[in-house]
Amino acid sequence: MTTASQTRTPRGRRSARPSGDDREAAILATAQRLLETKKFAEISVDDLAKGAGISRPTFYFYFPSKEAVLLSLIDPLIKRADSGFDNAVESMPADPQRAIRRGIEIFFNSFGSHPATARAGTEALKSSPEFKEFWSGLMQKWIAATAALITAERERGAAPDTIPALDLATSLNLMNERTMMAALADEQPGVAPEKVVATLTHIWLNSIYGTLPVGTA
């Protein structure tokens, strides 16, 4: 004898609801897509929530602000650039010229892999105290590491003792920031993207070590 439970037609499974990770990823993907065509200031929390298929209150469960979304997008770029800088510093004694070029190259390529995100970061520096404080901390770290590098090269007799190492390090890092972002934003005047690494490397090497033969960089 067949029971009712055996003859009952199985109910279809309910479609799985998006997980928290899925919703967060959707917000980030929406931000990346919008940044390709809009300035950061033109994008609202409502835009991000709508694009991710969630409500505005739900958005705030995952991010406290649109600036926090941008920080999440930029974080992997910064980690890649930071790692490249640290590796360059470690290899300085063996081949300082190649190490400096490689550090600049990794830094530029990291942000160049997502130029729209990098441009949004530059824009946020002018409008978001939260983002400005975050970026300032990174710049201070890179400047301090560069100053230590210059000092070490001077102490081992590889570089001349000229202007204060911290002043030189500050100027070089600020130059990198402005030159790279201008290239990524296709600003004029600006250095062409394919020439940025060679140009900055030339300036760094000549500033730290003095005049170098043409083609050394």
From Swiss-Prot:
Residues 1-22 are annotated as: Disordered. Residues 44-63 bind DNA. Pfam families: EthR_C (PF21313), TetR_N (PF00440). Gene3D superfamilies: Homeodomain-like (1.10.10.60), Tetracycline Repressor, domain 2 (1.10.357.10). GO terms for biological process: negative regulation of DNA-templated transcription. This is HTH-type transcriptional regulator EthR. Involved in the repression of teh monooxygenase EthA which is responsible of the formation of the active metabolite of ethionamide (ETH). Homodimer. The keyword rRNA-binding does not apply. The record marks N173, N176 as: Inhibitor-binding. The keyword Cell wall biogenesis/degradation does not apply. GO terms for molecular function: DNA-binding transcription factor activity; transcription cis-regulatory region binding. It comes from Mycolicibacterium smegmatis (strain ATCC 700084 / mc(2)155). It comes from the Bacteria. Residues 21-81 form the HTH tetR-type domain. Keywords: DNA-binding, Repressor, Transcription, Transcription regulation.
